Amino acid sequence: MSPQTETKAGVGFKAGVKEYKLTYYTPEYETKDTDILAAFRVTPQPGVPPEERGAAVAAESSTGTWTTVWTDGLTSLDRYKGRCYHIEPVPGEEDQFIAYVAYPLDLFEEGSVTNMFTSIVGNVFGFKALRALRLEDLRIPVAYVKTFQGPPHGIQVERDKLNKYGRPLLGCTIKPKLGLSAKNYGRAVYECLRGGLDFTKDDENVNSQPFMRWRDRFLFCAEAIYKSQAETGEIKGHYLNATAGTCEEMMKRAVFARELAVPIVMHDYLTGGFTANTSLSHYCRDNGLLLHIHRAMHAVIDRQKNHGMHFRVLAKALRMSGGDHIHAGTVVGKLEGERDITLGFVDLLRDDYIEKDRSRGIYFTQDWVSLPGVLPVASRGIHVWHMPALTEIFGDDSVLQFGGGTLGHPWGNAPGAVANRVALEACVKARNEGRDLAAEGGEIIREACKWSP
C-alpha cells in the first residue's frame, strides 16, 4: 500500500501526531461517480505546503483529527476518508490554491442537506492552520441527488398552476417592509396585483410582529388575492412568509395558508435552517402549495472572496432541500453581480444538466436527473428601464421582483404595477419579433408608454 493511502489498520497503531498528507493526499486517486466532490479555495498559514493543507481539509472534514487514534484500526479508513486528489493554483493569487476533495457517499445521511453541510463545512473552517477557506463548488452525484425530493413542484408545474407561459413572472415586495397595519398591507397587495403583477411578497423580516400579526396579514392578503383575481381573470399570489421561531409554528402558518386556498408561501431558508426548509418543502408538495425562498443572511456566508461559501453552493443546496423560487441576485440594479458567474448558478438552478465551465464559476459537471428546477428571482433595485436587460439576460423562466420600482411610481401602486406589466410585455413582444433589446430597449419602452392603459 502506498504511503499516501496507508491506514492505521494496515501498519499497526503508533501514537503521536502525523502529517495529514501521508494519509489524505492521494493525487493518484480516480474519483468515482458516487463521490461528492468539493472545490475549496485555501489560504494557508505561511510556510505550510499546499499538499499538507489540502490533506488537512480532507481529513478534518471527514475521518481525521489532529492526532493518531487507536480506534482507526477498528474501521476501514480507506473506505470512509476524504481524499485531496488535486491541487491547482489560483491565477493572480500567490498565497491561494484550489484543493479538490472527494468524499465517499457513505459519509452522508440520505436526503439531508443538514448532514451534508455539517460534515463538509461544519468544523474545518475554524482550523487554525488555515488563514481562510472558501467552498467554491460541490458536485452532487446522481446517487445522492435521488435521495432528495427537491423543489415541491418545479418550473413547469408552477406555470401550469398559474396558467402563465411565454414570459417572466412579475413580483413586488411590499414597502415599507415594517410598520404597516395588516389592512393597509393588504390594500397595497391588492393594488399591485390588480395593476398586473403576478405576485406580491412579504419582506424577509416580516414574520409576526406586534404591529402586524401573521394571521391578520394572511387574512387581508388572501382577501386581496381573491379580489384581484376576480377583477383581472388571472391567478394571483402573495408570498406569505411562514418563517417562525419554531418548526411547529412555521407549519401552523403553512397549514393556515393552505386553508385560505392561496397558491404560495415563503421561507427564509438560511435563517430558518435546512431542516425546517426541507420539512416545509415536503408539506408544500403534499398540499399543493408553491414555495418561495428568500436567502436572507447569504452575504454573511458568501460575500468574502476567500472565506465562506460561494452562493452557487447554497443554490445547489436549496434545489436539494426544496423551493420553487429563490432570490439569485441580478446583473443590473443596486445589487449588480458578475454576469457570467450569476448566470452560471442561475443555470444550476434551472437546468437538468450543466457542463463544467470555469469561466462561469462551474467547477464540476452537475447532473440533476429528474430533480425539478427552481425559478431564479432577480430583485433589488430594478425598475422598468432595466426590463430590456432583464428580459434578455434571465429569459422567460425567471421572476422579476420589483419593490420601489413598482411602489415608487408617482401615480401610486397600481399604476406602478401597470408600468411593470406594460414594459415586460413590450420587451417580450419585441424580443419575439427579433428586435435587439440591448440597442432598442429604451425606444421599445417609450413607445409602449404611449399606448399603456
From Swiss-Prot:
Its EC number is 4.1.1.39. Mg(2+) binds at residues 201, 203-204. This is Ribulose bisphosphate carboxylase large chain. The basic functional RuBisCO is composed of a large chain homodimer in a 'head-to-tail' conformation. In form I RuBisCO this homodimer is arranged in a barrel-like tetramer with the small subunits forming a tetrameric 'cap' on each end of the 'barrel'. The disulfide bond which can form in the large chain dimeric partners within the hexadecamer appears to be associated with oxidative stress and protein turnover. Heterohexadecamer of 8 large chains and 8 small chains; disulfide-linked. The disulfide link is formed within the large subunit homodimers. The keyword Acetylation applies. It is found in: Plastid, Chloroplast. The active site is at 175 (proton acceptor), 294 (proton acceptor). RuBisCO catalyzes two reactions: the carboxylation of D-ribulose 1,5-bisphosphate, the primary event in carbon dioxide fixation, as well as the oxidative fragmentation of the pentose substrate in the photorespiration process. Both reactions occur simultaneously and in competition at the same active site. One of its GO terms (biological process) is photorespiration. Substrate binds at residues 123, 173, 177, 295, 327, 379. One of its GO terms (cellular component) is chloroplast. It is an enzyme of class 4 (lyase). Keywords: Acetylation, Calvin cycle, Carbon dioxide fixation, Chloroplast, Disulfide bond, Lyase, Magnesium, Metal-binding, Methylation, Monooxygenase, Oxidoreductase, Photorespiration, Photosynthesis, Plastid. The gene is rbcL. Binds 1 Mg(2+) ion per subunit. Belongs to the RuBisCO large chain family. Type I subfamily. It catalyses: 2 (2R)-3-phosphoglycerate + 2 H(+) = D-ribulose 1,5-bisphosphate + CO2 + H2O; D-ribulose 1,5-bisphosphate + O2 = 2-phosphoglycolate + (2R)-3-phosphoglycerate + 2 H(+). The modification N-acetylproline is found at residue 3. It comes from Galium scabrum. InterPro entries: RuBisCO, RuBisCo_large_chain_AS, RuBisCO_lsu_C, RuBisCO_lsu_C_sf, RuBisCO_lsu_fd_N, RuBisCO_lsu_N_sf, RuBisCO_lsuI. The record marks 334 as: Transition state stabilizer. The modification N6-carboxylysine is found at residue 201.
